[in-house]
Amino acid sequence: MPFVELETNLPSQNVPQDLAEKLCSATATILGKPRERVNVTVRTGVSMVVGGSSAPCTQLFISSIGVVGTAEQNKEHSAKFFNFLTEQLGLAQDRILLRFVPIEPWQIGKNGTIMTFL
């Protein structure tokens, strides 16, 4: 069950209106998870500084069970997420940061229980 949170200082009018839907589909493909299990949040107009500059930028936080736990996995995922974000947001790669966080099934609650028991 991936959780993906995108924050950008781009104003909403400079971000594709359907970015959350596109990011959901891209995440499902990149991580090899069913689309219906992907959770996406997009926040625009956030006050941000990356590399000492408030020029247009974005951060993408990716957490998931089992697919973001190794350097090899994340190197592959990173290239694909960078391609997606540069295409969708028109930002240079040096204005994009990704953070991968592996999580365990017992750390996610759903339907009155935790994923361990679903």
Curated annotation (Swiss-Prot):
Class of enzymatic activity (EC top level): lyase
The keyword Cytoplasm is assigned to this record: yes
Catalyses which reaction(s): D-dopachrome + H(+) = 5,6-dihydroxyindole + CO2
Compartments where located: Cytoplasm
InterPro entries: Macrophage_inhib_fac, Tautomerase/MIF_sf
Keywords from the UniProt entry: Acetylation, Cytoplasm, Lyase, Melanin biosynthesis
Listed GO MF terms: D-dopachrome decarboxylase activity; phenylpyruvate tautomerase activity
EC number(s) from the headed UniProt entry: 4.1.1.84
Chain positions found as N-acetylproline: 2
Gene3D superfamilies hit by this protein: Macrophage Migration Inhibitory Factor
Biological process according to GO: melanin biosynthetic process
Main location: cytoplasm
Assembly and oligomerization: Homotrimer.
Main function: Tautomerization of D-dopachrome with decarboxylation to give 5,6-dihydroxyindole (DHI).
UniProt family annotation: Belongs to the MIF family.
Protein name: D-dopachrome decarboxylase-A
Organism: Xenopus laevis (African clawed frog)
Lineage: Eukaryota, Metazoa, Chordata, Craniata, Vertebrata
Gene name of the encoded protein: ddt-a
